[in-house]
Curated annotation (Swiss-Prot):
Pfam families (alphabetical): Iron_traffic
InterPro entries xref list: Fe_traffick_prot_YggX (IPR007457), Fe_traffick_prot_YggX_sf (IPR036766)
Highest taxon, organism lineage: Bacteria
Listed GO biological process terms: cellular response to oxidative stress
Hydrolase among keywords: no
Family per similarity comment: Belongs to the Fe(2+)-trafficking protein family.
GO molecular function, one term: iron ion binding
Keywords linked to the UniProt accession: Iron
This protein's name: Probable Fe(2+)-trafficking protein
Disulfide feature: none
């Protein structure tokens, strides 16, 4: 049976992560209150950030920036802003 958590990002019960993916206290918080679906959405945003801002994970400042963006996205409801990126519009004509 899947481990269920109340996901702070989705604001509902959802399948939790299988194991802690991030170190430290923040990692524990993510493991206990972020779902697999929310984590997958973050990974997409993280990839965009790393690529568009040319972040180097060997640089401590870049890692701090990425961690701050992750907290904002997962826990504070702030979307990731990437200069020049326009989300694909879905046509919802009925």
């Amino acid at each position: 049976m899947a481990r269920m958590v109340f996901c702070e990002y989705l604001k509902k019960e959802a399948e939790g992560l299988d194991f802690q993916l991030y170190p430290g206290e923040l990692g524990k918080r993510i493991f206990n209150s972020i779902s697999k679906q929310a984590w997958a959405e973050w990974i997409k945003k993280q990839t965009m950030l790393v690529n568009e801002k040319k972040l180097n994970m060997m640089n401590p400042e870049h890692r701090q920036l990425l961690e701050a963006e992750m907290v904002n996205f997962l826990f504070e409801g702030k979307d990731v802003h990437i200069d020049g990126y326009v989300p694909v519009q879905t046509n919802t004509k009925a």
